[in-house]
A protein has these predicted regions:
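Mg2+-dependent endonuclease catalytic cores in nucleic-acid-processing enzymes, primarily RNase H-like
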Residues: 83-194
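Hydrophobic residues at beta-strand termini and immediately following loops
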Residues: 6-8, 37, 100, 152
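Charged alpha-helix within mobile-element recombinases
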Residues: 187-210
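ATPase catalytic-site recognition across NTP-hydrolyzing enzymes
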Residues: 13-71
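Acidic two-metal-ion nuclease catalytic site recognized across multiple nuclease folds
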Residues: 46, 206-219
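An active-site-proximal beta-strand-loop segment
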Residues: 69-82
Length: 219
């Protein structure tokens, strides 16, 4: 049978509310918006975080802190790191990346590492990846501490998990505070094809617990 194909943007559909499209443009990374709403064929290579999107500045005083943890239990030199990211969210929605740290340690040392970061930052919530053996870390911290722990079960791939933050980087809504380690930007600017992405994953988990308050609504 003969067939024909059309390539048309969502904006050409009279049944789609223009306001809905505008909101999607604000909440999605540009590559996703161009693919899904503008019907463009976009090459995803190198389309994640761009250096020109990075902003630097100080975090306002008095904002609550949130910690995200991407777990890896190993001391082997080739193993992944346990990554920790500390963020705050300003009244205007700006995300402040306040601290980044990582360790390559065994179970007991990882527990101490998380406790140390919590003691330093006094977080309102700690989001910890909770899958398979990593669930034991969450259970042990809940048993032996009074820390505000929330186990997070990854239900999406890492690029999709990071997409809300990617959109905010592109819209100049993420601020890097002073003193962050150089490896953080190395990971960020090579994500998702770099050798390591542990602290980027931790940042995505920090965003999940920071951005989950219903009072903030959808962003």
């Amino acid at each position: 049978d003969d067939w024909m194909a059309w390539q048309m943007p969502t904006t050409a559909n009279p049944w789609i509310d223009a306001e809905e499209v505008d909101k999607a443009g604000e909440s999605l990374p540009s590559i996703a918006f161009r693919q899904e709403y503008l019907a463009e064929f976009v090459d995803a290579a190198g389309a994640r975080i761009k250096r020109e999107w990075l902003r630097y500045g100080d975090c306002p005083e008095g904002l609550p802190t949130y910690i995200g943890v991407d777990l890896a239990i190993s001391t082997k030199s080739e193993a992944d790191y346990t990554g920790v990211a500390v963020v705050s969210r300003g009244d205007d929605g700006t995300i402040y990346v306040r601290d980044i740290n990582r360790t390559r340690s065994d179970f007991a040392a990882v527990l101490r590492f998380i406790e140390m970061m919590a003691e330093k930052w006094k977080p309102s919530m700690i989001g910890i990846e909770q899958v398979q053996y990593q669930a034991a870390v969450v259970q042990e911290l809940l048993r032996r501490t009074k820390l505000p722990i929330r186990g997070i079960r990854p239900d999406r791939d890492k690029v999709t998990r990071f997409a809300p933050l990617e959109a905010r980087y592109e819209q100049s809504q993420v601020m890097h505070c002073q003193g962050l380690p150089a490896y953080f930007e190395d990971e960020l600017l090579s994500f998702p094809v770099g050798r390591h992405d542990d602290v980027v994953d931790a940042l995505a988990y920090a965003w999940q617990v920071c951005g989950s308050k219903r009072s903030w609504g959808a962003v």
